[in-house]
């Protein structure tokens, strides 16, 4: 069995949450909606520091513009794309004071939605569970 450690961050602005549509240029889960996510690249890196790096890279928010509201213990989900592969997901909830973001190439669209509306979007696996566990 192979394991990959990843972070998934939900970003909240007032009562809305940010969803990102993964572009067709990414390696996995193309054209589905997600939070801000990324692989923890080495054992010396903490999940929180990786989450902040991914937020800056994917939506252009520097650390002083985000506030950590909550983190949960990791969850494991089996990969839908790779056999004998498990994703260890470290979930975070951040808050921002402004809805202004700048997408990079990893995502093609973004929306701010009411959390309950997530059921209307095709998302990466476990995103709904992660979201409602954090809220």
Protein language model regions, located:
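Short secondary-structure boundary/capping segments
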Residues: 1, 9, 25, 84, ...
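Conserved N-terminal beta-strand and adjoining loop/helix that marks the start
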Residues: 1-18, 39-41, 93
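A generic structural micro-feature
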Residues: 1-3, 29-32, 82-88
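Short loop segments at secondary-structure junctions
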Residues: 13-16, 23, 95-100, 115-117
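Conserved Nudix-box catalytic region and its N-terminal flanking loop in Nudix hydrolases
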Residues: 16-57
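Active-site segment of metal-dependent pyrophosphate-handling enzymes
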Residues: 60-100
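NUDIX/MutT-family hydrolases
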Residues: 91-93, 102-132
